[in-house]
Design a protein with these regions (language model features):
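Helix N-cap and loop-to-helix transition residues
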Residues: 41, 78, 89-91, 121, ...
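Short linear capping/connector segments at secondary-structure termini
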Residues: 74-81
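Short, flexible active-site-proximal loops enriched in glycine and acidic residues
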Residues: 67-73
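Conserved, well-structured interaction surfaces
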Residues: 1-67, 82-95, 101-115
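An aromatic- and glycine-enriched ligand-binding surface/loop that stacks and positions planar moieties
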Residues: 1, 68, 94, 101-105, ...
Length: 179
């Protein structure tokens, strides 16, 4: 069993670990580079691009969590391109991930309605950005315990929580009422 299935059933081995999502990243990059030529209205283009940026940021964040700096490929690669891309520093990766998330935050709505419910919202992406900033401030990526990383994470998460709550999101008052 591979991926999450292997984890669920206790069958995960070193040979079955599959966390190298450059295929998905390549597909996202192709979509981002070619969407402008498509016959789609601007509002839909903006929405699709924002959602693709979130997915790319999420995929890169998963790799950075495991490996630190990874090669950041932001354009579709042709078959003739060099496969040995230089590894970016962790700080460069985090900055590019945050840039993708910031671009998505600017483009996404606070809430979706109708058939679009369940898509990424501004609140979701702000929460993800806050989480990534906390990871970047943590001992895993901040062994020198630089205070400015913690301050950045705190300031952003506080602002994000206030904006998210002001736009109708929040925590349930009672755990038992969730069910």
């Amino acid at each position: 069993a591979y991926g999450e299935t292997g984890i669920l059933y206790g069958q995960l081995t070193t040979a079955s670990i599959d966390n190298w999502p450059y295929k998905e990243i390549r597909n996202i990059n192709i979509m981002l580079s070619s969407i402008e030529t498509g016959n789609i209205d601007n509002a839909t283009k903006t929405s699709l691009k924002a959602q693709a940026l979130v997915l790319r940021a999420w995929r890169y964040f998963q790799m950075v969590r495991l490996y630190g700096g990874v090669p950041m490929i932001l354009e579709p690669q042709a078959l003739t391109d060099d496969l040995y891309v230089t590894r970016n520093k962790t700080s460069e990766c985090i900055n590019l991930i945050i840039k993708d998330l910031d671009d998505a935050i600017d483009a996404l709505p606070w809430k979706w309605t109708g058939d679009d419910e369940g898509r990424f919202t501004k609140a979701t992406v702000m929460a993800l950005k806050g989480r990534i900033l906390l990871y970047y401030a943590s001992p895993q990526f901040n062994p020198e315990n630089k205070a400015e990383r913690w301050e950045t994470a705190y300031t952003y998460n506080k602002m994000a929580a206030e904006q998210i709550e002001a736009n109708g999101y929040g925590l349930y008052d009672s755990y038992e009422n969730i069910w």
